[in-house]
Amino acid sequence: MSKYEVLQGFYAVHDELGSGGFGKVRLATHLLTNQKVAIKIIDKKQLGHDLPRVQTEMDALRNLSHQNICRLYHYIETEDKFFIVMEYCSGGEMFDYIVRKERLEESEARHFFRQLVSAIAFVHSQGYAHRDLKPENLLLTEDLHLKLIDFGLCAKTEKGRIDKHNLDTCCGSPAYAAPELIQGLQYKGNEADVWSMGILLYTLLVGALPFEDDNMQIMYKKIQSGCFYEPEFLSPLSKQLLRAMLQVVPERRISVKKLLEHDWLNHKYTQPVKWNTIYDKNFIDRDVARVMSKYYGFESTDKMIEKIKEWNFDYMTSTYYALLHRKRNGMEIILPMVRNSTNTAPPNVQNILCSPTIHASLENNLDKSGLEDDDSDPSSISSSSDISARLKKNCVVSDESSSSRFVKPMSPAAEKDKKMSYVNAMLTMPSQFTGRSPLRIPESPMSVRSSDSASLGSAATPSRGGVKDNDKENASTGKNYRMGASTCKSRGPLKITGVEEGTMKSVYTTPNTRPTLRGLFSPGNAEHKKRQRARSSDRASIGMPPGSPVSIGSAHSANNELLADGRTPRSRIKTNRLPQRVFTSLERKKEKLITLLTPRKMQRDSPQVLKDVKNMVNVSMTASQDPEEVRNLLKKVFDDERMRYELNGWKFLATQETVHGWMTVELEIVRLQMFDKVGIRRKRLKGDAFMYKKVCEKILQMAKIE
């Protein structure tokens, strides 16, 4: 029995993205659409008295649908677990971006902070207070859009009266908590969130915490004093804003309304921050609904729309969001033609909490005022996948022109240029602090091609020829290529070309140059296909050593009768080794089938190969070309620092005890094909973000790999 039986047939669960006190977050694939999602798995036994927090988080996520808040797709409750399926943010944690650049330029910090203020202004307008704002709860999409997560500690008040309601629960992370929380006083949620945003802004601009100490009591005293260091490189406007947000007395603290109008926040922007949601719960994309109606067997698109509007947050809701994500990224909207009759949910899947939510896109309201305008909706790099004619006959595809209210996708080339203009500007901007950009070296003009995602073997799995997933992930996803893979994507028999004519071709010899492989059934091979059988006996006799099984069989067949057209009967040219040859053929076909159905694996003696790391802010490039050397250096650092670690191939899982608890980080040695260098991919699995930053910087510095 599977560990996550309730997810079988709906999601394929992959690597761990992170963990907390009550559960883990795993990367997964939505099987019907092949889109990546994140699944938060919470153990009820570990929750104990905190069980109501999950219900609070679910209520918040259903109602807080905003462009800068991570979207809820699907909610499943079983006897012992909660499964929260959410939008996957492939850009990783915001803190990885800070670790990569050490601190951000003010224009970069402004880009992200405007999005955070937009999200919090909307949260407060709906009567919620987040109460746990910290870098770990800020994620990035592949196009550097910020998404707020983790509403487990949020507080709900009457809508529009958050500034009138007092709270008394002390919660959140100490380094980001407001003074009134530390003192145990009653507080207002909106004022506490403004303080935490001030800490985050300081972190973005300086790369450090304003109030920090290994001794918790000393750190509390620093927070209550409100005194913090102001580096000289900060502009007067940024200093003014930080002082206004980090006021010890809550009544003197700047309000969110005034924060939205502050000069620093709107510097070089043509429009103020748009904090209202761009989604409308009453608007459903008709293209997506039409495809879903054919799959689910609804009589009309309108019937499907009415069903989606129930917002049950079941697999149907998840499918709608996944297809909507494909459309927004210029990918084809496609589902199998007929719903599999065996694709029924297990009984415990039916135990799903249901409630309406705000959603649906009003993309035309986005701010299009320029590169720095944060509210614009950059499209994805991903282009539409190539769908064969045979597949299209068996699949449902949207056939309506883009006449709906949803923005029509641009051409793949235009989409890529539009998005990369800003992403590259952000990632290649040199830092004043370090003097280098996150990439640190020029881009290579090499082309990038996505690979297939892992095979999905279940009743609900689309056919193998389905649309490829063009999402870009930090984890092992479509853009990660591995060395030593022996698979070949050509279909059917292969013809070897590129060998000089006139040279004797023996099946036991290898050409000096690497041959070109091409499918035998391509248009250019029509004549070859007609002549193939006629030359089968000739192939066996050319270049064979005397006495070999093939040459003996050929000599024997020469004495047999010929057919009317002069050809030798196929049965006559076979030898008494036929059973063995048939068995060998079957074995080879079995190996090929296994190879096709198994994801590419890296060789044990080679690290994983990454073809493209442009948007991977959690990858550090080394000066070395020898992965073994880097691995030995990391081992030495871990031993010198007396850090516990486990080594699995090229992946380190290191842990260290800190004043804030245990810190767990994953470091994987990879090969950067674009630059012909060895890199290190970082991932924080558990612990405080700043401790993660310190540990990573210390390890990379001591290993002398930056």
Swiss-Prot record:
The role this protein plays is:
Serine/threonine-protein kinase involved in cell autonomous neuroblast asymmetric divisions that generate one precursor cell and one apoptotic cell by controlling spindle positioning, myosin distribution and the segregation of cell fate determinants. Plays a role in neural fate specification in several dopaminergic linages, acting in concert with ham-1. Involved in phosphorylation of multiple proteins associated with key developmental processes, including the cell cycle, apoptosis, endocytosis, and asymmetric cell division.
Keyword vocabulary terms for this entry: Apoptosis, ATP-binding, Cytoplasm, Cytoskeleton, Developmental protein, Kinase, Neurogenesis, Nucleotide-binding, Serine/threonine-protein kinase, Transferase
Q: What is this protein called?
A: Maternal embryonic leucine zipper kinase
Spans traversing the lipid bilayer: none
> Which amino acids does the record list as binding ATP?
L17, G18, S19, G20, G21, F22, G23, K24, V25, K40
Checking CDD domains in the record gives:
MELK_C, STKc_MELK, UBA_MELK
Q: What is its EC number?
A: 2.7.11.1
| Gene Ontology BP annotations | apoptotic process; asymmetric neuroblast division; dopaminergic neuron differentiation; hemidesmosome assembly; negative regulation of apoptotic process involved in development; neuroblast development; positive regulation of apoptotic process; regulation of cell adhesion
Q: InterPro entries per the record?
A: KA1/Ssp2_C (IPR028375), KA1_dom (IPR001772), Kinase-like_dom_sf (IPR011009), MELK (IPR034673), Prot_kinase_dom (IPR000719), Protein_kinase_ATP_BS (IPR017441), Ser/Thr_kinase_AS (IPR008271)
Q: Which organism is it from?
A: Caenorhabditis elegans
Q: Where in or outside the cell? A: Cytoplasm; Cytoplasm, Cytoskeleton, Microtubule organizing center, Centrosome
Name of a matching Pfam family: KA1
List the effects observed when the gene is inactivated: During neuroblast differentiation, mutants produce an additional precursor cell for the HSN/PHB, I2, M4 and PLM/ALN and Q.a and Q.p lineages. The nucleus size of the 2 Q.p daughter cells is similar. Symmetrical distribution of myosin II during QR.a cell division. Abnormally high number of ADE neurons. Double knockouts of pig-1 and ced-3 have impaired cell shedding during embryogenesis which results in the generation of an ectopic excretory cell and an ERM-like neuron.
| GO CC terms of this entry | centrosome; cytoplasm
Q: Name one GO molecular function term.
A: ATP binding
Which of the seven top EC classes does this enzyme belong to?
transferase
User: How is the protein modified post-translationally, according to the record?
Assistant: May be phosphorylated at Thr-169 by par-4 and/or autophosphorylated which likely results in its activation. Phosphorylation is not required for co-localization with the centrosome.
Q: Where is this region: Disordered?
A: 366-386, 433-493, 506-555
- The protein's superkingdom reads Eukaryota
The similarity annotation says: Belongs to the protein kinase superfamily. CAMK Ser/Thr protein kinase family. SNF1 subfamily.
Domain (Protein kinase) spans: 11-265
Compositional bias, Polar residues, is annotated for 447-461, 506-515
